[in-house]
A protein has these predicted regions:
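Flexible "arm" and connector segments at domain edges
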Residues: 1-63, 67-110
Length: 110
């Protein structure tokens, strides 16, 4: 899976400087991080709704959309997939692979 995400990310980077009129990805990047973050949120909600309905194929399809939009957001913020993979490895070393890092007090993203 990591190879597929890296290929997706690299394809997004190739479109980053394209004319927005010629590429949906370039258009989304040109809209900026707020618009992309909104798309990420929308896709996450769609994954959750399909999961609640036990729609396996829907979850698969919407998960692919979510990963695409998340990769666009990463590219816009100059976050490479390996940065995320490194964080996953760090958490695995601290807490085990199936545990989420405890949230710090003080709000989201702090």
């Amino acid at each position: 899976m990591t190879d597929a995400l890296i290929r997706l990310y690299d394809a997004i980077l190739e479109r980053k400087d394209m004319d927005p009129a010629e590429s949906k990805t370039a258009r989304l990047i040109a809209a900026g991080p707020k618009k992309i973050a909104k798309k990420v949120g929308e896709e996450a909600v769609e994954v959750a709704l399909d999961a609640m309905n036990e729609d396996r194929q829907g979850v698969i399809n919407e998960s692919a959309d979510l990963l695409y939009n998340l990769s666009v957001l990463w590219a816009t913020l100059n976050i490479r997939p390996n940065d995320v993979f490194d964080e996953i490895r760090r958490r695995e070393e601290l807490y085990g692979i199936a545990e989420k890092l405890p949230k710090p007090t003080g709000g989201a993203g702090k």
